[in-house]
Amino acid sequence: AEDPDGCCTLAIHAEDPEALAGLDAGKLNRVSLARRTFLKPWQEYTMNDRVQWCVAAVPAPSWAAKVFPELPVEEAVEKLWQVIFDVCRVSTGDPVTAWQEHVAKTKARRDQLNAWNLDHVHIVSSNGTDLTVGLADDATWEGASSKTDGGIEFIANVPTEEVFCAPHRERVNGTVYGTKPYVYNGQLIEGWHVTFKDGKVVEHGAKKNASLLAELLSTDENSNRI
């Protein structure tokens, strides 16, 4: 639309996690950068909540097969549909009420985090993760739902369980180990880890597609920061 204000956008994803496996990581990264440049006007509208927007996923056979490799593909797709219905609260019998209750609980958690006025978050895990993330000055916690400039409330991600806050770009230190594969440019980065010092990545690695991770972290001057 010439004037997108007042419009809504819905993105439905059905991705193959390894659709581009084996292709040159550098070329894929350049394609991704070009795509982001082309979509920048749309992203400015959505990321600034000027319009209502939502991202949701539906099963693709290749994705379902990755999640449930022990099942025949058709059964895997059906099972993944059921998982999506469950986590999206479709299976509750009254999804609208279920979402209203979930949003209320998430907002309560968000408000508690803001009341604590945290300086930083320290994340530790049995897999070796030990990461301290300093929060940006005057940062606030957000989550659950958003509002457009016109005051219309909407949920941007279905499902969503997160509350989030902006980190300080120079106050991130430690190492994070991924517990799940990371899908980037149609390829899987598996067994990955990233180490930060003063907000900048100083060491990284992966058991699979380490070169793709390196390309991702060298996309531009700020891509090696959290």
Report each predicted region and the residues it spans.
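Short loop/turn motifs at secondary-structure junctions and domain boundaries
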Residues: 183-187
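Beta-strand elements of well-folded, non-transmembrane domains
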Residues: 180-182, 198
